[in-house]
UniProtKB/Swiss-Prot annotation:
Record InterPro entries: P-loop_NTPase, RapZ-like, RapZ-like_N, RapZ_C
Keywords for this protein: ATP-binding, GTP-binding, Nucleotide-binding
Positions of ATP binding: G8, R9, S10, G11, S12, G13, K14, S15
Domain of life: Bacteria
This protein's name: Nucleotide-binding protein PSEEN1090
Free-text function comment from the UniProt entry: Displays ATPase and GTPase activities.
GO molecular-function term, one example from the UniProt record: ATP binding
Organism: Pseudomonas entomophila (strain L48)
Binding site for GTP: D60, A61, R62, N63
Keyword match GTP-binding: yes
Family, per entry: Belongs to the RapZ-like family.
Record carries keyword Cell cycle: no
């Protein structure tokens, strides 16, 4: 049995995540009291009417604070029943959450006459801290629209042909912020920039003119070799430590040229020696 626990601050995309999981065959429960987590795991295994191979639940700040504080031991108790438990934590920056509540005109569950929306969001962060700390996978939804979030969840949680650590090699542009879910970040902004070549500006690192230009630059090749050597040596150690997910982020200024080129090459290289290697270009 596989159990996916979805959590995160209000407005970060938990409902969308549950919808995706339900569409992919998961039995979903919204706003499960955290204290019932071990009981759910046991019932799903032994009760033939409830038995499901794939279950997903959301746990949010409407829980009793004491249950959220006890989340680490509740999760461990569920895992002792030999269930594969994955914790997905969704989040976005505070300005984005404020904007989403303003646009939808929904009420935050922790607001009241004495607590503003901004204060409620900060209180929610504290309450959900024990879950965030134990997340196997964190997804920053700040820059994702609905369809991108659905694709990201399917890519990271559901597209795993082999058991073991799932590796994501992701390009991004620093001007839109670093991915908060990145485990390793490599800055390639020091490399020659095709953006300053008028004939290359409108092309991406996936297109042959940019590929040919960057492949001819000695610094680019040296950077690629250095990053490759590091990853080939140390990523197997991450896998050996039972990490469920590892995100390697490659950043340039805009996320269109240098980081895309390096990311594509790294993905192709790592797929030759590691299982579950996926490639994503955040800002294309």
């Amino acid at each position: 049995m596989r159990l996916i626990i979805v959590s995160g601050r209000s407005g970060s995309g938990k409902s969308t995540a549950l919808d995706v999981l339900e569409d992919n065959g998961y039995y979903c429960i919204d706003n499960l009291p955290a204290g019932l987590l071990p009981q759910l795991a046991e019932n799903a295994l032994i009760n033939t009417e409830l038995q499901q191979p794939k279950v997903a639940v959301s746990i949010d700040a409407r829980n009793l604070p004491s249950h959220l504080t006890r989340f680490p031991e509740l999760l461990e108790e569920a895992r002792t029943r030999h269930i594969q438990c994955d914790v997905l934590y969704l989040d976005a920056d505070e300005d984005t959450l404020l904007k989403r509540f303003s646009e939808t005109r929904r009420r935050h569950p922790l607001t009241n006459a004495n607590r503003s929306l901004a204060e409620a969001i900060r209180v929610e962060s504290e309450l959900l801290g024990p879950i965030a700390d134990l997340a196997d996978l964190k997804i920053d939804t700040t820059s994702l629209n609905l369809y991108q979030l659905r694709d990201s969840i399917k890519l990271r949680l559901l597209n795993q042909p082999e058991p073991g650590t799932a590796f994501l090699v992701e390009s991004f542009g620093f001007k839109r912020g670093m991915p908060v879910d990145a485990d390793l970040v490599f800055d390639v902004r020091c490399l020659p920039n095709p953006y300053w070549k008028p004939e290359l500006r409108e092309h991406s690192g996936l297109e042959q003119p940019v590929i040919d230009y960057l492949a001819a630059q000695p610094d680019v090749e040296e950077m690629f070799q250095d990053i490759s050597t590091y990853l080939l040596k140390w990523l197997p150690r991450f896998a050996a430590s039972n990490r469920a997910y590892v995100t390697i982020a490659i950043g340039c200024t805009g996320g269109h040229h240098r980081s895309v080129y390096i990311t594509e090459r790294l993905g192709q290289l790592l797929q030759q020696s590691l299982k579950n290697v996926q490639v994503r270009h955040r800002d294309l």
